[in-house]
């Protein structure tokens, strides 16, 4: 202690000496400014100027003054206020405040404010007092009160001092809420008392309103309380159901189900249970139910009663009234739903039963019941034939089908004309054409089937590869003609026959339903019988034969006309040979068809249907005079021109009372396209080189000329020569090479080396020839008029 006092005396003496000593040299204010400026320029000194520039201060001293301001303001200082108090730029204050907060862990920079631990401890004490007063507090309330960020309050204030300064606990479901244990105990007491007083289902919202407890606290404390009841859910419309009430519900449901083996949803809903199906599943976990729209049937009622009764009904071939075995309070809709559900679960075969107004009939029972109606159907069919009603129906139906076919043809032709017009507009004005100007393949909604026609061999005895067929009209157009269905059996007739049997069982009220059920079936049986009787009449057979031959002849004449256009593109000599071949093949078919028809009309016996010229002449001389001259003239016309043959054929058709169809040139393109498609299909299936070349030549001719051609294999060279100008040199060389190899194979021995080499080369070139024929197109296609 004495040494300290001596030290104080020595310092006082030094201080007195300094005061008494006079300054050797005083500096003026200007000199001081210059010295400071020089130090600043040489960066030997760092100062901070005030806002007015009249004063300056070192950063370290400014930092001390900021800390003094923090202390003077109780541990929380707003940097804007500090800047105004110290008369220093705010940016300087902020920079130093950040340095202070970074260097001192006890100081925090929050939203432009410096806050130290003393202030944090102070507000923690305030929070603790408020929590003790209210019992619960949230971070959002504290943020509003202290004007501080909620994250800062939660992490650096509340959670940091929780259990120390702040006496409370954090809500597990909501970390931003804190409460005291005493508050929790008060809430538990309120909840326990309220739930103990409830004897019927009560809305949770009503309970919370009465006891003034928050919903989240109610649900979090409910499990800890273990009340004598349960809450239906945690949603807004949740209810609290006391166990005593739930037990009463369960006892009633169990008792009702035990007595009746079914449960009504409405009855369960009246007990205060909203989801009846879920409640039933929960109440009877080991029971199987058939859940319907209004009721739930137990498995015992379904299996032991209904299914057993249905099986017995099927075995005895009788009927079953379901109202006698099902509960009386089930409506007809419920009973029908029960039956449908049982059939859907395949407890029994659905095809064995018919359900009508709560009555289930076995199929054999109904079959036996309507058995007399089949005799009625046959009688009605015979009466319709005898009276001509069915014949009139057939005629009207045929006319309607022809009318629909004509509408479809007009529609298809109109579409085809529009497509042609669009193609012409698109191609007009274009020079050349190239790949962009090629002909577009037109699809038709009508299908033409061209029958195979066996062509006779010409002088070179070569096989023909052309196959023509009869064409059938496709579906109808928009204005279809309909024929009223012919009902040979009436509902009243069926009711009259089955009513007597139903009256014995007291089921006469079901007669109209059963009659309607079998009306269509009996009508179809009657129509089938009428058709059978109709086809059995000789007159009908003759009329059908007449119509079929007329259609075939017209088809062949159209084919000849189309082939004639194609052969006219060749030279005169080749054209003459093609005409001769055409008449020997298709013309011969026409003569045979008509000769056989006339022989049938004249009751002449013909052993062989493939007739030659001499046989046809002999047959014509034996037939009636009205046919004789026309048939003889037609046979002679086979060696003349196509026009002569067509005129002779028209005479024969006139004698046979057959009609020649009017030429419809609009259909030509469709027929040509169909013919080409058939040739292409044959080409894809063909493996024989000679036939393949023949088909390829015909397809290329059709593509290039737009016409079809009926030619045998000997005309392949002429066809290739004709289309030569439309193909490239490479394509021509390939076809000629393939043609030469085919001739080599035909002219050499099959087992020779030359033949084998030629076969190998043909196999290599085959795909190229097929590809050329299938994919070749031209910008413009020349067509015969």
Swiss-Prot record:
GO MF assignments: UFM1 ligase activity
EC number: 2.3.2.-
One GO process term, biological-process aspect: regulation of proteasomal ubiquitin-dependent protein catabolic process
Entry-linked InterPro entries: Ufl1 (IPR018611), Ufl1-like_C (IPR056761), Ufl1_dom (IPR056580), Ufl1_N (IPR056579)
Ranges where the record places region Disordered: 405-483
Cellular component annotations (GO), alphabetically ordered: endoplasmic reticulum membrane
Swiss-Prot/TrEMBL keywords: Transferase, Ubl conjugation pathway
Superkingdom as given in the UniProt entry: Eukaryota
Class of enzymatic activity (EC top level): transferase
Family the entry assigns: Belongs to the UFL1 family.
Protein role: E3 UFM1-protein ligase that mediates ufmylation of target proteins.
Protein name: E3 UFM1-protein ligase 1 homolog
Organism, as annotated: Drosophila pseudoobscura pseudoobscura (Fruit fly)
